[in-house]
């Protein structure tokens, strides 16, 4: 074992690098020293730190004098910001933030070189800060409005469900009154006009109208099924789109049920693509209005 250790130790000594020796140090050629200067460094033109300079990599100076700043500028008004989209506000926020960073760097540099004349920089920064505060105010207004809409939508759904239950529970002496209430409700909540001639076909027939048609048709159908349980087994629930729902808006529930039964027995296609729903409703309602005029 000792023999092996000696052999390894001898090999290690033999392979060890010998120190370098110069016979004559005067013959060694040294490179001239590099003078430290910014010209010795190449900075990428798209380096992120260029964002802290007013003109990016084209900036000619690292500090702008007061005369170089736009002192005639003003902050954005709240009214102007309210007309901007979320994308515009997002972009404007970061443009303002970038300019504030440039000003902050220049003020810090001025402190380092004992340049105290930075009050103009501070004035411009105050305008930018005011713009940021107003952007936050506009976003807060939109957030508050959104939350109120959400709350109203929830309250609306609760009211619609409550009315549906009262409509289904109404007895024969109350149903006429509830039908009148339903007419007022469908107009107030969904824009469904009491008379066909009151419609603006291009603006009134929309997604809101479709939602109202779904609500009105199913509430009438549910009451009809409650009074005629044998029909429920035959027709089934729910209705298949606006083609089957529209008769409940235009006619008595019993007549509407017969029309739905005839549609299904004929094998006609009643499920429409979404893009065809509004054109179908406009055409069908106009045809119903013309038929009323001939009667």
Curated annotation (Swiss-Prot):
Disulfide bonds: none annotated. Its main location: mitochondrion. One of its GO terms (cellular component) is mitochondrial large ribosomal subunit. Pfam families: MRP-L47. GO terms for molecular function: structural constituent of ribosome. The keyword Transit peptide applies. Keywords: Mitochondrion, Ribonucleoprotein, Ribosomal protein, Transit peptide. InterPro entries: MRP-L47_sf (IPR038340), Ribosomal_uL29_mit (IPR010729). GO terms for biological process: mitochondrial translation. It is found in: Mitochondrion. The keyword Mitochondrion applies. Component of the mitochondrial large ribosomal subunit. Mature mitochondrial ribosomes consist of a small (37S) and a large (54S) subunit. The 37S subunit contains at least 33 different proteins and 1 molecule of RNA (15S). The 54S subunit contains at least 45 different proteins and 1 molecule of RNA (21S). Belongs to the universal ribosomal protein uL29 family. This is Large ribosomal subunit protein uL29m. The lineage of its organism: Eukaryota, Fungi, Dikarya, Ascomycota, Saccharomycotina.
